[in-house]
Design a protein with these regions (language model features):
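Alpha-helical cap/lid subdomain in secreted, periplasmic
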Residues: 61-262, 266, 270-276
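Serine-esterase "nucleophile elbow" of acetyl-processing enzymes
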Residues: 1-57, 61, 66-67
Length: 276
């Protein structure tokens, strides 16, 4: 049986647990497992809650170089938000939240942060575009079937003021001084326009036929998987403008936790399957 190798963030994590609804049963199969069943493949799900794109790329690379190439049926990169930072330390994982054991090195763990990444949004986007190209080059070097896509919008949420976590929001419902979002400080006259220019500039270096939803930006005619599966079409230029996300409630865990529930994961798996 061939292997389906996938990495991503909490929307992919097979062990996902809701931080704001801890009693919610999240033991249902996630979209990679559902997709693997459709493809009659063994699922190698490397997804981790809170993961950024360094983790996603690095775990895919490590899995690819250590797996006999004739055993690989398909590789999927499910990219996340650009503001996230991933790093490794030589340390044991004692069950801490957002710390994940390195699959191939028991002395190392992965950690991640949502805020405080070095650089700015323009660098982060260029960094992501380089991951797109590097992942594609790695797969083509070994003649491996692959697809890549943004599970989440890469930068709109950050430009509009990154939302606090669902855990923080739920635990501050009675706090009138609580700010739901971090404030974004613009660096140009139109940061959004400058961000839009970057994927357009790099497009000639990317095999867009193998990129589901390219260029992954709604205003440029692309999309993130979350937007096309878990949200309605009640949007203007971006689903992330303001607080109006327009989630389909039947497909998410709760009013505060926007992660897909069992039906949401089923829809994501079907959406991706139809585009392979």
């Amino acid at each position: 049986m061939k292997k389906l190798i996938v990495s991503g963030c909490s929307f992919t994590d097979k062990n996902f647990k809701s931080m704001s609804s801890p009693d919610y049963d999240c033991s249902f199969p996630k979209w990679p497992e559902l997709l693997a069943k459709k493809l009659d493949m063994e699922c190698i799900n490397l997804g981790a809650s809170g993961a950024g794109n360094n983790y996603i790329y690095s775990t895919l690379l490590e899995e690819i170089i250590r797996t006999p190439k004739n055993e690989i049926g398909l590789i999927l990169a499910s990219w996340s938000q650009v503001n996230r930072e991933d790093y490794q330390v030589r340390e044991k994982n004692y069950g801490r939240t957002f710390a994940f054991q390195d699959k191939f090195d028991n002395n190392m763990i992965w950690k991640n942060e949502r805020i405080g990444r070095q650089g700015d949004v323009f660098y982060w986007i260029k960094d992501l575009l380089r991951y797109y190209i590097s992942f594609e080059s790695l797969c083509k070097k070994h003649n491996l079937p692959y697809k890549q896509f943004q599970m989440l919008n890469p930068f709109e949420g950050y430009l509009n003021g990154l939302s606090k976590t669902d855990f923080e929001i739920v635990n501050n419902l009675d706090n009138s001084n609580f700010e739901k979002r971090y404030k974004y400080q613009p660096k140009t006259k139109d940061d959004r326009l400058e961000c839009f220019k970057l994927p357009i500039e790099y497009e000639k270096f990317i095999d867009t036929e193998n990129f589901i939803g390219w260029p992954a930006i709604w205003s440029l005619g692309g999309y993130a998987i979350e937007e096309k599966t878990l949200m309605t079409d009640k949007r203007h230029n971006s689903v992330f403008y303001g607080d109006k996300r327009h989630n389909i409630k039947e497909l998410i865990i709760s009013d505060y936790d926007y992660h897909p529930n069992a039906k949401g994961h089923q829809k994501i798996s079907e959406f991706i399957y139809e585009r392979l």
